[in-house]
A protein has these predicted regions:
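Well-ordered beta-strand positions in beta-sheet-rich domains
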Residues: 1, 44-46, 64-66, 149
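Boundary regions of SH3-family modules and the immediately adjacent low-complexity/disordered segments
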Residues: 1-18
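A short, sequence-level motif marking secondary-structure junctions
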Residues: 4-8, 46-53, 104-108
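A mature extracytoplasmic/lumenal domain signature
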Residues: 6, 26, 33-35, 71, ...
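Short, surface-exposed secondary-structure junctions/capping segments
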Residues: 15-19, 56-70
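Glycine-rich catalytic cores of cysteine/serine-nucleophile enzymes that process amide/ester linkages
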Residues: 24-60
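Conserved hydrophobic/aromatic pocket- or pore-lining residues that grip, position, or stack substrates
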Residues: 29, 67, 92
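Exported/periplasmic cell-wall-interacting domains
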Residues: 62, 74-154
């Protein structure tokens, strides 16, 4: 079992009005919001999830998660080194090392990249859910920490 220090219980009275769905088979992401008695689709976009390429890349884990943290720029390292490889914009963390974020920007480039033609095709990331940068910003702005549920399924 997982040691208690790594588990943050959610009270049984907690409800979620915002949900993110990631389909790793079809490589897409959707956001839904509970309004009144209905769930409304707020967005649907192509995405790229994690690929199996040990020791640095792994599949996006399947399961139910909660948005836990946000970083406007998530810095990442070059595989196997301590050298900065670049950053992923508008990163919303849903599990240890797993983020929903925009198109990665490899160093030394500093400007954002809106789209990648590989979105919606095959798994390519290290574990994260990569999507268009404008959509990642939407998720980043729209999904409150500890109040947004994330479903990763195949």
């Amino acid at each position: 079992l997982v040691p208690g220090k790594y588990v943050k219980p959610i009270a049984d009275s907690v409800t979620f009005d915002k949900a993110i769905f990631v389909d790793v088979t079809n490589q897409n992401i959707a956001t839904l919001e509970h309004t009144g008695s209905k769930w409304l689709v707020r967005s649907m976009n192509p995405a790229t999830t994690g690929q199996h390429r040990p020791p640095y890349a792994q599949e996006t884990p399947l399961g139910i998660f909660v948005v836990q943290e946000k970083k406007a720029r998530m810095i990442y390292l070059v595989d196997g080194s301590k050298e900065t490889g670049g950053f992923a914009p508008y990163a919303s963390r849903f599990t240890n090392g797993g983020y929903i974020h925009g198109v990665p920007v490899n160093a030394p480039r500093k400007s954002l990249i809106e789209y990648s033609p590989t979105l919606g095709t095959t798994p390519r990331s290290h574990m994260c859910v990569r999507n268009a940068t404008s959509h990642a910003k939407f998720v980043y702005d729209w999904a409150p920490v500890n109040e947004t549920i994330v479903f990763i399924f195949d």
